[in-house]
């Protein structure tokens, strides 16, 4: 026992020295102490001195004050108790980069007071000064504890007290021992401790109710009670249930007044604290020694110094004391953390061992925690950057001065003492023993109340119960979480969102988990040594260290129980916002960590980087879970269950694997399994290579090609790979799930921002902070990271390493998600439809910088029903995914703060359209209405949405196709889109879709059975050409080439097409806008506008017929029932005789005879007579009057369509494209030949038995062979006609091929004349339809179906739609080779220029429903046509009739519902006609065809005026022609005969001259009546007469001269001259049409070797022909599918598809295939027995190689008229005449030279005379021809000079 005789002065000095040695307080000396008893000292309102506290690690003391401090000695000096009440400390973080910081932290205040007894008694001044540091949170805890091993006295760095003397006493040794014992039993107790942390962005306050520190036998026990952490700044959302109370106000008042009593009332929860506080307060106030003046002086000096130091610090933005911040803080700062109890036990002080921590209950409010942590991370990152720049400046200045002479000492660091200390402490007990937390609860929504409990009973809590961590030895650490669950509380009900299975029998689970641990390579103590608590834990883990020297760790986490998630809407709302908050915290932490890593890298660089010798640790982490079940409650009747099979993760392999993931759906009691199945899911965290594609930027490609994507290899830091994704669900189930998910997501999106724990509600009244929270990721990275790499490289921007690093950085993706295979099966789409199957492969998405990119290698969407498979979306060649060189779909998503752009690129995809699918769909639903409602619903902006992010979607397509499959025909067509772009943008009131397509081609085939097998091109030639043009390593086949090789015909091309679609979503807002702007246009829900630049089509008769029927069959057949078309009510019976006029037929004869058919009165008279007869009154303007008035304001049209076509050119070719058509025509001729052969054999037999006259009688009585093919080709021939003549007649009819007759005769075989038929498409077109400025407008007024929708009883009639067609200009060009005219039809330009905005043809159709209850409608049509000018050549007319009358039975469709035309009106039409007949059909004339009489007369300028006609009640459009014929026929007979007769060619001049005489009299009279000027009137009449008469006389002269020239040319040609061929561009010849005959002899002739000279000539001929064809054809190259030739020779239309460069090089000229030659050689020898007739016919359509034409005559040019290129003036006439004379004289000279050479070669006089007689006519006639031509040219010039108006017509009539 310690004796009680120690003097009071010594006790007082002991306690005083304890206070002085703390070095914390301001001036404290003996006079300042108040002595209460022998062993008590009480201080009140003592301020801490920041300077004496010194440097603290990581922070600075800004202010400190203690309300009361009581020091008590126990039993003399056997122990010291320190009681502190109401301690308040203010600190600020300091991130000073100091090299000695770690050394300062190593020392404690215990070392400075190690030998207090020596200091007190002996006053030793030896020792070294040391910096003293203290932990700010427990500054009074560790200062006075003494380690037994510390014996060296360390005097404090402080001035000596006045009480301390320099004398030594005899009691020194005894007192030293006594003081050591007393200080070793030090006991500290702190009540109501407040620590305030202030920084630039964040202020925190920690409140501790009590802290007690006791030492017992070397074991320190720290007990902490009631810890609260509050957020003072920023002003954050405290959470739900927070109520502002008076407790925080008391707290602030107590801190201001520094009253320990108030602080005790507020913060104390322990009973013993009350006694201590009461005792301390009473002792201090009743003290006899302590004076109040001294106390006030002590307090004032402390606070004044504290404020001075704080103010002098000068750190901007930091808070120095509470008084300055009190006004800015909330009255009730939210509590973010509460811990009720924490006990810490450990041994030792300088070396801590046997650490045990036991925590009671922890409650954490996550709502205020999120913005607090984000603000802390931002502030720390900002401060570190500032300190970094400061340290950098110091380092630069220091490096310039230090150790310049001894650089080896630059980076000295003494690490030997640390190694020795570590080796000395290795034998001690372990540092850590146990850590336990009873419960740790995180509330996602609730706030914390003052008592530490959650304020709101409702919400979601994340609970960790009984967390244990134990250390078995220095190498093994293990533990677990006994219970982990997530619970939602709502209205006193508890719902488990997440929980593990409850523990069952131990033997069932223990073996499997122990096995997994053995595989992991960890200790078996996880299951054996942890005890019963951890063996049943939900989460277990082990941390194993392989050896003491190694830093490698093996961490194993095992969740052996099955986990269950149960989510509903409210749970997902809270947890989703919770996840967003965690993500934001993680992002900010990542930015802070990046800053710290940058600083560490800089420090290593500045320190020399000598620490690289240590090997990087290779830790291993293993995670193993059981099956996870996730349930989503979408609605009351719909639940989704996600089953995740066990998860395995190995950090060393850097891979997480899941064998399978299933998604099931539960609807009531029905469960559908396998809705979605994911197989073999892998998460790879190491760098993984994958294949990516980038758009090539090659600019060397031609205009018609597009650069292909470039394949590259990239690396990804994080990869998710799914081997197979499969889904199988019915359409009804999919609709059900989709509808429920849609409602769920809409409600989720609507309610998510309003949640209290959302990021939007984290900050209160601080929009700046919220903005920084959302954009801090980009802001912080831009402040530091973006500027550093340039400096670290030490290279300029132009140096190569920078460029290289930049390129390497591009190839590293942040993450990658890949699906190797994906399959979707949707069953029961419609009852009759079948199933949908979607198959995709190699789906990859990855993030590159801030963009998300992806691709889908192959896509296939199919409809399956039974054995039927129909493709909807597929690759056009149907290649396997392994054969594809680039993806079919590419996706790029650009993420931005204001705009998100999604770019989708499609290549080589085909979208198929099947008409029969419309029949398979549900008829009860209106497709148009459903689509309309869906679109409006999708694009209608949400009123609750406040997001400013704009979404733009762009589609791009290259070489994509749209397949058109009719419903009842076997033909098929494809639209090939070369390039297309589509932009989708969302507006406030409207939603826009803008599309642009280029190079749209159309291909067609008559029957899908005729599709040929595709042959791959040769790799050598194709690859070389491909690499040269595209620079790609693989061969790419253009879709147009592909389909052409399959047998499709290229029909047309559209240059550019623009499509714009506008969806009006807010009609009321648009109405208001239109009213303000004065816009009167009607509004529509959908507005479609299409603009086509240039359209070109090449058609034959059969392809045109197929195309028209294909378009008709692309829609559903329109059929109405009788009850839908008419209403018949038999309720009251029907009186048949009611309403019948008995005298209806009485005056019929008189009425017809009184009809006046003259002029324009015809229509009105006929109408009135019919009205009188039928007693029906027609109101013509009934529907016109109410056209739009009913709908202008109240009604909104569903759809408006506007189509504008700038130019449309339709080339009509002769011949036929389809093989079946050609075979049918040849078959008819073949049948005739067969019948003729049989007839000839019969005749020969008859001749032997019968006399001659009987045979002649039989021949006379023979009938005629006739057959009509395709309703356009009429084959008529007598039975005795030669078959060869019949074939020639058909050729003349189809091709006008006269000169080819001789060649056909030479190559024809007996009985094989049908093979001489020329039936293929001509290389040149015959007619050209040139249409310009076509406008089509469609206004849909109603889509209502009376069968489904209700009908308004007050509606008298209903407008359905209005269609208007306008054609600005119509020109039909005549290109028939035998025709000399230019335009077949055009506007009558002689009338002058048209008015701007007028159209040549205008057609308007108004569809109405007279009875709104009926489905069928009626049409009201109005047609107006401008005056027309016609130049009709009979050959062109025959071709036109034959073209449009062509009908193929294969494409006949059943008639649709008849369109009833209620009213048809056509305006008056003026016509001026020229007609040139070529032949007369006498057979038709004999059969009664009166129209053949017109072929006897040539018409020139006949005028016709067709009056205005109105027709009513026309049953169908075909009846319109009959009605017009009946209406106009009387007009021809009565009024138009004179106009027609006046146009007869011989009478034309007479009529015109007669008109001149008429003008001589009529014009003066009319002019005199106007102004009374006689002389001027006579002058005008005379001028008009002279002009007319003179022009006609000159025109007669031109005709006589031209006729003479023609006769002379024909005579010269008969005598062997060149004739009219001199005027032709080419030297005559036949039509460019080869035989369709697979002739036997011709291949043998072609197979003979030709000289190279001939080949070159041939290629030049073809090149020339190609140039001429392109002048009237496509501007780009055309390609026709004529590879499968049924003609032996090459078809000329192939020329147009051959490159000119190849033609000029003559490299394509090949003989027929060797196989074909070998096959045909036996036929040339007459060996026909081996093949049947059918085989020969099939043989005609086999493939032939291309070879050149033998001569230039095979390319026939169009005949040139003598009236072409007329001179416009007399001067031009003289020049043309001189040129004509020169040309003909040159020919005469040439002929004379030829005669001279021939005379020189003759030997006899007879030969000379023959030569002279042979050439004399030509020599004599050629000058005459030149003279007549010169005269005609001169007269033309004079005539055109006189009357220039006639020249306008001649330019239209004759080609230039």
Curated annotation (Swiss-Prot):
<feature type="compositionally biased region" description="Polar residues">
    <location>
        <begin position="1621"/>
        <end position="1639"/>
    </location>
</feature>
<dbReference type="Pfam" id="PF13329">
    <property type="entry name" value="ATG2_CAD"/>
</dbReference>
<feature type="compositionally biased region" description="Acidic residues">
    <location>
        <begin position="1732"/>
        <end position="1741"/>
    </location>
</feature>
<keyword id="KW-0072">Autophagy</keyword>
<feature type="compositionally biased region" description="Acidic residues">
    <location>
        <begin position="270"/>
        <end position="280"/>
    </location>
</feature>
<feature type="region of interest" description="Disordered">
    <location>
        <begin position="1157"/>
        <end position="1177"/>
    </location>
</feature>
<dbReference type="GO" id="GO:0000422">
    <property type="term" value="P:autophagy of mitochondrion"/>
</dbReference>
<keyword id="KW-0445">Lipid transport</keyword>
<keyword id="KW-0256">Endoplasmic reticulum</keyword>
<dbReference type="GO" id="GO:0032266">
    <property type="term" value="F:phosphatidylinositol-3-phosphate binding"/>
</dbReference>
<dbReference type="GO" id="GO:0061908">
    <property type="term" value="C:phagophore"/>
</dbReference>
<feature type="region of interest" description="Disordered">
    <location>
        <begin position="229"/>
        <end position="283"/>
    </location>
</feature>
<feature type="compositionally biased region" description="Polar residues">
    <location>
        <begin position="250"/>
        <end position="262"/>
    </location>
</feature>
<dbReference type="GO" id="GO:0000407">
    <property type="term" value="C:phagophore assembly site"/>
</dbReference>
<feature type="compositionally biased region" description="Acidic residues">
    <location>
        <begin position="137"/>
        <end position="147"/>
    </location>
</feature>
<feature type="region of interest" description="Disordered">
    <location>
        <begin position="309"/>
        <end position="328"/>
    </location>
</feature>
<dbReference type="GO" id="GO:0061723">
    <property type="term" value="P:glycophagy"/>
</dbReference>
<feature type="region of interest" description="Disordered">
    <location>
        <begin position="1614"/>
        <end position="1647"/>
    </location>
</feature>
<feature type="compositionally biased region" description="Low complexity">
    <location>
        <begin position="1157"/>
        <end position="1170"/>
    </location>
</feature>
<dbReference type="GO" id="GO:0005789">
    <property type="term" value="C:endoplasmic reticulum membrane"/>
</dbReference>
<protein>
    <recommendedName>
        <fullName>Autophagy-related protein 2</fullName>
    </recommendedName>
</protein>
<dbReference type="InterPro" id="IPR026849">
    <property type="entry name" value="ATG2"/>
</dbReference>
<dbReference type="GO" id="GO:0034727">
    <property type="term" value="P:piecemeal microautophagy of the nucleus"/>
</dbReference>
<feature type="region of interest" description="Disordered">
    <location>
        <begin position="1719"/>
        <end position="1741"/>
    </location>
</feature>
<dbReference type="GO" id="GO:0006869">
    <property type="term" value="P:lipid transport"/>
</dbReference>
<dbReference type="GO" id="GO:0034045">
    <property type="term" value="C:phagophore assembly site membrane"/>
</dbReference>
<feature type="region of interest" description="Disordered">
    <location>
        <begin position="395"/>
        <end position="428"/>
    </location>
</feature>
<keyword id="KW-0653">Protein transport</keyword>
<keyword id="KW-0472">Membrane</keyword>
<dbReference type="GO" id="GO:0061709">
    <property type="term" value="P:reticulophagy"/>
</dbReference>
<keyword id="KW-0813">Transport</keyword>
<dbReference type="GO" id="GO:0000045">
    <property type="term" value="P:autophagosome assembly"/>
</dbReference>
<dbReference type="GO" id="GO:0015031">
    <property type="term" value="P:protein transport"/>
</dbReference>
<dbReference type="GO" id="GO:0000425">
    <property type="term" value="P:pexophagy"/>
</dbReference>
<comment type="similarity">
    <text>Belongs to the ATG2 family.</text>
</comment>
<feature type="region of interest" description="Disordered">
    <location>
        <begin position="123"/>
        <end position="167"/>
    </location>
</feature>
<dbReference type="GO" id="GO:0043495">
    <property type="term" value="F:protein-membrane adaptor activity"/>
</dbReference>
<comment type="function">
    <text>Lipid transfer protein required for autophagosome completion and peroxisome degradation. Tethers the edge of the isolation membrane (IM) to the endoplasmic reticulum (ER) and mediates direct lipid transfer from ER to IM for IM expansion. ATG2/SPO72 binds to the ER exit site (ERES), which is the membrane source for autophagosome formation, using basic residues in its N-terminal region (NR) and to the expanding edge of the IM through its C-terminal region. The latter binding is assisted by an ATG18-PtdIns3P interaction.</text>
</comment>
<feature type="compositionally biased region" description="Acidic residues">
    <location>
        <begin position="412"/>
        <end position="424"/>
    </location>
</feature>
